[in-house]
Every structure is written in C-alpha cells, then in structure tokens.
C-alpha cells in the first residue's frame, strides 16, 4: 500500500505540470529577456544592442581575460540563468548560426566545449536550407520550414526543451524530453565572419 501511495503521489505531481503552450501568444506569456555575458564571449565575438546581439568578427575584440571565457569555439552564454518556464526568440543572419542552451559548468576549452558535443549542452544548427540538432555528440536531422527566427521554449521542471521555426506561424522543429540537473543558459555559436544572432525584444 505504501508503494502504491508513492506511485499515486508521483502521478499527481506529473499531472500538475502545465502543458506546453499551443500558440505564440501562449509562449509569450513566458517570454524571458536574454542578454549575453561579455565574460563568456570568445575573443572574435562582438556584442552590441545592449548585449542582445553577437557578431562574428575577423579581429580579436578587447575582451579582458576571464575564467568564464570560451577560448576555442566562437560561443557566448547568456548572463541570465534559466529555471522554471522560459521562452525567447533569436533572429539569425548568415550561413551557420547555432542556437543553444547549456549549463554554466560547460568546459571553456579543450575540444569538449562545443555546444551540442557534450552532455552539458543542446544545440540547433541553423543553415539557410537545413537544420540539425546536436546533443552529446549525437546528430539528429531536423525538418521544418526555414526561418531566420528561432523560438526556444524551456520547462526546466518538466525537462522539456523545444525549438520552433517562427514566422507568421510557429512550427515545432525539435523537442527534447530529459532531466535538467543545473540551471540553463542560452547560448550562441557563430561559424562565419560577419554572421550574427540577436535575442529579440518580445515585451
């Protein structure tokens, strides 16, 4: 009887979790303002627009030494740590921009720091004609309408991470069901010089 009570309590807790929104208006109720942390930006990344936009540059930027800075990959993390239910959108430009979430404890160098190629990050790779999802060095092809705007929804408690193509409508590109063990941070990786990504103002 005691074990059955535990099962019932678990089911009740799962049932209590709110479902994922079904409309953009529903997602916007959980909109999260995202700013990028200059202390994590790789030296060839320039931040602008109040640290909401990141652009890959040819020359090193004047970033001071910091233990949180990515030294190899052209990556940056958000200043905000994300728990609970959050939604944000990224407008990207170019030919190779990665929209990611990661734990702050991700490595900053040494080949295991690339978003999507370790167990501490999840990445949607965006090209003009294709998407690919990566986690823990496993590649998953993604099909869906191409858009320069990607919506990201996180329900940290429920272990849900979803990526959406956003235009006049929202189309689910990829959903992850997992258990998050740390707060998450939004992340961007930019492959090519001149490419950029900007976190959109939704409020």
Predicted ranges, named:
Residues 1-203:
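Beta-rich ligand-recognition domains in immune and ubiquitin systems
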